[in-house]
Swiss-Prot record:
Family to which the UniProt record says this protein belongs: Belongs to the RapZ-like family.
Function: Displays ATPase and GTPase activities.
PANTHER family in UniProt: RNASE ADAPTER PROTEIN RAPZ
Keywords of the record: ATP-binding, GTP-binding, Nucleotide-binding
Gene3D superfamilies linked to this entry: P-loop containing nucleotide triphosphate hydrolases
Keyword Electron transport annotated: no
Sequence positions that bind GTP: 58-61
GO molecular function: ATP binding; GTP binding
Positions that bind ATP: 8-15
Naturally occurring in which organism (per UniProt): Neisseria gonorrhoeae (strain ATCC 700825 / FA 1090)
Keyword Plastid: no
Cited NCBIfam families: PRK05416.1
Protein name: Nucleotide-binding protein NGO_0315
Amino acid sequence: MKIVLISGLSGSGKSVALRQMEDLGYFCVDNLPLEMLPSLVSYHIERADETELAVSVDVRSGIDIAQAREQIAYLRGLGHRVEVLFVEAEEAVLVRRFSETRRGHPLSNQDMTLLESLKKEREWLFPLKEIAYCIDTSKMNAQQLRHAVRQWLKVERTGLLVVLESFGFKYGVPNNADFMFDMRSLPNPYYDPELRPYTGMDKPVWDYLDGQPLAQEMVDGIERFVTRWLPRLEDESRSYVTVAIGCTGGQHRSVYIVEKLARRLKGRYELLIRHRQAQNLSGR
């Protein structure tokens, strides 16, 4: 049976993610105490219900991170496919969302300010984030989060999932990256008026960067680094690794390098491609 655990920071969009799972046909349970998870799975199996499970767990249920990891290992040992999704956002964004909704933080009744509650929650959940696929919703609306969840679920995983993500430094760096590479030293197609309207997915930009020795050296170097260290992360039972590749605006160089690297890693690892700034890309 496939089981998806959804966790993350309050105000980051866990409820939206869970509703998306429900719309996709998952049997969803919100705020389930973790000690009840094996019983829920057993009950589901006894009913001969083939519907996949999605369960939201967070600080409201007094989540014990050590227990969470034990439960995940236990269920995987029984042959179940357990995936973990962690939803987060930047602190300033969360503060704004709480202010707009006028809702209190789940930990705010413990004599803590909102900022203190957010910091405590982030520290508390960090060990769970380490084994999860992370979605940062800081610059997302509900529809974009739903799309990100659907894209993640499309990838069939049997081993380590490598997320290759392009981004623009001027919009901020992704906080869920395991490895980050800076492409701003490469020749920039943006300064060519004929190339500016395109992205790193388009043939004119590919032709331009294919002809730049520095760009090819960069791809070679990242490929060597990634293929050197990914096996070590696999040995540590990591399920997801995010490789973030940035340029100034996240439209040309970083997109090109991600796509180029994906072609080289295809067949060796399960890949998920994300372009944070280049939302509407045409194919090469």
